[in-house]
Amino acid sequence: VPFPSNILEAISKMSFSHAMDRVASTRSSAGTLARPTLNLHLDRGRVSITKNSGSNIQNRSDSNGSQHPEPKPFILILLLAVLLGLLAFPVGLQAQELADLKRFIGKNDSILVTDANGQAVLEKNADKKRMPASILKIFTSLVALHYLGDDYRFPTEFYLDDQSNLKIKGYGDPLLISEVISKISQVLAVLLKSSQPLNDLVLDDSYFQQPLTIPGITSSTQPYDAPNGSLCVNFNTVSFKLTSQGYVSAEPQTPLLPFVIKKIKASGLKQGRIVFSHSQNEIVLYAGKLFQYFFEKQGMHFKGKVKLGRINDNNDRLIFRYDSSSSLAQIVVKLLEHSNNFTTNQLLIATGAKIIGPPGTLAKGVTIASDYAKEILNNEDITIVEGSGISRDNRISAVQMNQVLQEFLPYHHLMRRQGREFYKTGTLYGVSTRAGYIKRSNGEFYRYVIMFNTPGKSTNALILRLLRILD
């Protein structure tokens, strides 16, 4: 039973054997007194009580020879009642403090907190489906980890055809960034040293269906609206600023290509970030232009142009396969930390393509996620229309999200950590959510889900109260 440390110290100094000797003795048939005792065991802030039948001792008498009277049974009962009442007090206090938190949960909100055994210690509206916002990323990450494996690495393949065209085929790697492309170009410059000059740089983005439309994604310049594709670089965004010398890249590792400057000028922005779209194949063409820049920086030459095309499996020769330097588990760490919508849906679509077959589509990814919910979570009622939580059409209950957390427990270390808490937050207009784990002193975990679908509410104050109450 949980017990306050100051009272534990006082209890540990008490002699219950002596008290029970005077209060709870009973006469034995041999004319001796059998002395039952209550033993207290203190361990990690908890008290347990055991009763020993005791050994026989000689009946004691006063100096005048009179014997002690036998104790009244009600005295023993009274003492036990007082003890049990004291021991139950902290448990009742914690339960009351948790129950008081229900006042923060409105009709459009939900909360569920369970212990390591799955028993609810706090719940309200837990079976009502809510908009999860970005805590849905936990579910999508779990689906990808289940089907692809935590050490899965996204490939990108490079081919050479008989016309000296260099071809690149993408498979959805969300972390093809400038630093990676620079390293790839160093390898290819060595491998293709005898094949210079090259003709065209051909880009194959057929592993994902194009264009991909994600519910909730708009055509804004915000990074969270970056579209998806199988051959994308730098999250389909470029950061820039305007100086006295003109527009420059805000990231020294990434050049500001003429292809990009034209789009920046059209935006009218002086600084910030632009997002490429599916319009006029911007996404894949930007990837090709960036690869070309780093190839030429390593001394490679192209006589032709950057264009879209396809790999010919019969005639084209695979010369290099780059497997992502980041495992899927490492990608999940980054997407949960930065709440990256682009990366999350890349995982969902790539998982669908891997399991069902290319081309990858959002529908295939959603199908795989739904299959996981049915087969692993034994739940057919999760509504998912995309993987990141940006769509307001996603729906999941606190009970269902708690099931996700139960399965995600082996991966809890991939989440952001703050003290005893491992967590993911979510935010949309009028939506504030938080889900994760609270680690106990004994190493076990509470699982919690908080979903506010009421405008103006935040989960911050509530989680602080939970952390204070829960051991």
Model-assigned labels for residue ranges:
Residues 8, 17, 22, 40-42, ...:
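Short hydrophobic targeting helices and cationic amphipathic motifs
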Residues 131-144:
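Active/ligand-binding-proximal structured segments within catalytic/core domains
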Residues 24-27, 33-36, 41-47, 60, ...:
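Short, low-complexity intrinsically disordered segments enriched in A/P/G/S/L with frequent Arg
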Residues 3-17, 22-29, 35, 48:
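Low-acidity, Ser/Thr- and Arg-rich intrinsically disordered low-complexity segments
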Residues 383-471:
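C-terminal soluble interaction/assembly domains
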Residues 97-99, 146-379:
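Conserved serine DD-peptidase/penicillin-binding transpeptidase domain
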Residues 77-88:
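Bacterial N-terminal signal peptides
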Residues 93-131, 148-154, 187-195, 467-469:
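Beta-lactamase-like hydrolase cores
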